[in-house]
From Swiss-Prot:
Similarity remark: Belongs to the ClpX chaperone family. HslU subfamily.
GN (gene name): hslU
Name of the protein in question: ATP-dependent protease ATPase subunit HslU
Pfam families given in the database record: AAA (PF00004), AAA_2 (PF07724)
Organism: Teredinibacter turnerae (strain ATCC 39867 / T7901)
Binding site for ATP: 18, 60-65, 252, 317, 389
Keywords noted in UniProt: ATP-binding, Chaperone, Cytoplasm, Nucleotide-binding, Stress response
UniProt GO cellular component terms: HslUV protease complex
């Protein structure tokens, strides 16, 4: 679990997301409170429940990006889901309890990766011995044993230096579990995975011989040896505990399940989904293939654009379970400028790196960046406002000719205001063209 302070979390998010300080502060405090809760006395710890967050803001301003970056920072079980994928219990589709099942599966995967990383060195040593056994015939006498020992050291040195990577050897390794594809109706994924696990366990313990290059064999044997060193029962217990105590669920597009006054037809995936989410967010026990999971201390962060609805259109009970409200601001031309240059691996850096592979040197001048930002902002204002995502469209159209005409020769392209006007002038000013092309 992350031990970063709120200030450090915001500083890390600043590297990738421009502005939106209120939202960053809210998620940073919520993440830090997870750590703070684990430090208090156990009797009080169970009484401290997470304060769930509702992020409100137009599309393309950074709501989903905050979730993506938070997942990497949290170092805790984390899952991001779309509210629109769920239907209420009794209808075809996924029920909301599958969120918790996926969270637990993700937690087990996270802990398995951490454990495998810890015992990686021991696993590599064991894999090395198995490859040397395959490369060298067994000794038949004590004299041969001594000779084999020195030969083994020579081969070990060659193996570590990569001289034997392309040599093909025959090794005995664990048999691949039987692959059984089961087509099940939506909403029955849990039963499907249990059936697949049952068929997989039927082939466990069996081995097979395979011919592989030393490089591929070393990787497969390292993974196999690492898996042997892991205590699966202990790992599952720790992963379930982490999911219950430190798990974070990010529910995107929550506004799409609000009831609309002018909507006709059954609200299968709307109010019903909200009512199903209530016990999950309030705290209940969910049955999974790994056992019963309590959701009392899982942190829920919901987000939505609320273009066609308002947060007050959510059912009152759900509003009460999302006590912290954060409003994200619409992006200005200045924000677009910063998005193009400031974040790590910014859009301009990505395009420069891609074209550099073919000898094209791409340079962006300050007035060029400004003009790109203004163009994206103007198109957003005149057509649909899709926020920072508009920059992807504008940049792709701007550099289309440069990307198409590369032929391996060294070329220098300077993207200034004149270049932008030449490539995008007509598209940006003609509303019909910008609506369908940009």
């Amino acid at each position: 679990m992350s031990q970063m302070t709120p200030r450090e979390i915001v500083s890390e998010l600043d590297k990738f997301i421009v502005g939106q300080q209120a939202a960053k502060k809210a998620v940073a405090i919520a993440l830090r409170n997870r750590w703070r809760r684990m430090q208090v006395d156990k009797s009080l710890r169970n009484e401290i429940t997470p304060k769930n967050i509702l992020m409100i803001g137009p599309t393309g301003v950074g709501k989903t990006e905050i979730a993506r970056r938070l997942a990497k920072l949290a170092n805790a079980p984390f899952i991001k889901v779309e509210a629109t994928k769920f239907t209420e219990v009794g209808y075809v589709g996924r029920d909301v309890e599958s969120i918790v099942r996926d969270l637990v599966d993700g937690s087990i995967k996270l802990f398995r990766e951490q454990e495998m990383a810890k015992c990686r060195y021991r696993a590599m040593e064991a894999a090395e011995e198995r490859i040397l056994d395959a490369l060298l015939p067994p000794a038949r006498s004590s004299g041969e044993e001594q000779h084999e020992s020195s030969t083994r050291q020579i081969f070990r040195k060659k193996l570590r230096e990569g001289d034997l990577d392309d040599k093909e050897i025959e090794i005995e390794m664990a048999a691949t579990p039987v692959g059984v594809e089961i087509m099940a109706p939506p909403g029955m994924e849990d039963m499907t995975s249990q059936l697949q696990n049952m068929f997989s366990s039927m082939s466990s313990g069996k081995t097979r011989k395979a011919k592989l290059t030393v490089k591929k064999a070393f990787k497969k044997l390292t993974d196999e040896e690492a898996a042997k060193l892991i205590n699966e029962e202990e790992l599952k217990a720790q992963a379930i505990e982490a999911a219950e105590q430190n798990g974070i669920v990010f529910i995107d597009e929550i506004d799409k399940v609000t009831k609309r006054d002018n909507a006709s037809g059954a609200d299968v995936s709307r109010e019903g989904v909200q009512r199903d989410l209530l016990p999950l967010i309030e705290g209940c026990t969910v049955s999974t293939k790994h056992g019963m999971i309590k959701t009392d201390h899982i942190l829920f962060i919901a987000s939505g654009a609320f273009h066609l609805s308002k947060p007050s259109d959510l059912i009152p009970e759900l509003q009460g379970r999302l006590p912290i409200r954060v409003e994200l601001e619409a992006l200005s031309p200045e924000d677009f400028e910063r998005i193009l240059t400031e974040p790590d691996a910014s859009l301009t850096e990505q395009h420069q790196a891609l074209l550099a592979t073919e000898g094209v040197s791409l340079a962006f001048s300050k007035d060029g960046i400004r003009r790109i930002a203004e163009t994206a902002f103007d198109v957003n204002e005149r057509t649909e406002n899709i926020g920072a995502r508009r920059l992807h469209t504008v940049l792709e159209k701007l550099l289309e000719e440069a990307s198409f005409n590369t032929d391996g020769e060294s070329v220098e392209i300077v993207v200034d205001a004149a270049f932008v006007d030449k490539q995008l002038g007509e598209l940006a000013t003609n509303e019909d063209l910008s609506r369908y092309i940009l």
